[in-house]
Amino acid sequence: MSDFIFCYDSFVKGYLCEYIKEVNKKYRFYLTKKSYIKIIFKYISDLKYLVVNFNDSIKFMKFIVKKDIHCDLKYHGHYKCQSLKNYATYFKYIVQNKCLENIRVFFGRFIPVVKLQSGISRVIDESPKKLFGNIVIDIEIIKTIFKYGPLSETESIIEYMLQTTPNLTDEFANDIIAIYKRKIIKYLDTNNDDNTHINEKFHFPNFLIMAYKNDDVYLFNFINDDFFQIVDDLNNIDKTKLNKKQLRTLELFNYKYKLNNQSINSIILPNLIRNDYVKLVKYFCPKIFKELITGFGNFSLLNELILENILIYNNLEYMEIICECIEHTNPELVNKLLPSSRSVEMAQLLIDHGADYEAFYYSNTFILSNISVKKHVAKLVREIL
């Protein structure tokens, strides 16, 4: 069981000491005049900490939130104060043990106080992979974290959980997107009394991860349809009442969640194409890739890195999808790709879809091409002579 450990530096002590009494060499922390919890003290790296039993941690966090107290992490220096490490340990425990109420209070009430008092952007700064490893997270836990946590805290956590949690359904996708919709509407609601969230950058989790994992076209379209509806709803907001940050967020939201040539590029390159430029999790999704490419309006606007990396990593399935879309409408592009082929299989695929291998053979680019490809093309040319 994970205790809740709270920094008890001189600043915090000045506020909390009046609530602590020593009785028979044991300490009581009084939440009210009559109600108390038992605590102990311990030192970590020469700093004093107050330790609360896990079963009392919700009561303690609510007390801290009410009093609006926390040490100044920037003053200590993250290297010395162990609070963030302690909170990460507590968070890991409540996730593993499905402690929903603890998650609600920790993310929804306690973390905002820590951020406000400490002036830090993130409280849980350990990577989700390091925290959870291969642990499968319950979907109710995911929804609870996302519902109650600030987006700046939950974005990377949610994305990791979406990557590692199996069998996520369209019902779950609908629930998690509905939570997101409420968050962005709250952000854009000028009548909302709680405007502290407006001071933070608005985050955009990659919900399409749920579809990428199993190359699920139905789920991919389901998620996109949900977001198209949100875009329509948001466009009905009176923009004259929004500040510059809110308007920028709305602009980014429209860009990110409207399927057009530009956004299709931004989906394909970082998520579906293996490359050395963007170090993110990659998914092999020929069905989704085909869905996107088929809807691409102007192939001259297709990001060159997409084609370049398909050739570099010899992705025949992706290239065949592209060729099927362009062989009759853009034969020049098929011809352009042939000299950059890295394998005989790729070269032959392009030739099968109309690439002019004879013109390539007599071109200045032939000598600079892949050796195996040159031998193959030379053989084909000899056969027709």
UniProtKB/Swiss-Prot annotation:
UniProt superkingdom: Viruses
Family: Belongs to the mimivirus L17x/L18x family.
Name of the molecule in the record: Uncharacterized protein L175
Species assigned in the record: Acanthamoeba polyphaga mimivirus (APMV)
Organism lineage string: Viruses, Varidnaviria, Bamfordvirae, Nucleocytoviricota, Megaviricetes
